[in-house]
Amino acid sequence: MDNGIELDNTEVGVILTGSEEAGLRGAKAWCEAHKGEFDDVPTFIISYDTIHDPNYLKTNYRDLNGTVKADKDVSDLFMEAAKELNIPCKKGWVPPLGGATDSAAFAQAGFRATGVTGLNHKLEDYYHTRRDTYDNMNAEGLAGCYAVSVKALEMFDKGAKQ
């Protein structure tokens, strides 16, 4: 691969969903359309939402206002990858009135999933406003999250948390 990322036993897919703010409808529709499709192979989903501030990179062990449990092994794998890279990542949850990430819909549908966020839940002025634009993204926050994600994939590829 161009970036030197080589996985021998792992296929990576990308799911782009919409309508998280409208009851997780995009993720729920995807889950319904692909129900049972991945039952024969170890599969996990990492759902990213508002990766902005590197000081708030967090693996959410609970989602949907704290009412839905994320997969502990998937959450732990992301945390272990961050620790190995010495990238600060906190164990957290999407709190009451904090909403949800698509991870909640994936978990409710039976997928092994966790949500990763990078925002202050005291909500900044860019969150869900007209200031929530591509040029308000934080390169350092995205780079750290990307590095941890690659490390987690490499660990999974070698048999971790399957």
Give a label for each model feature.
Residues I51-Q162:
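Active-site-adjacent substrate-binding region
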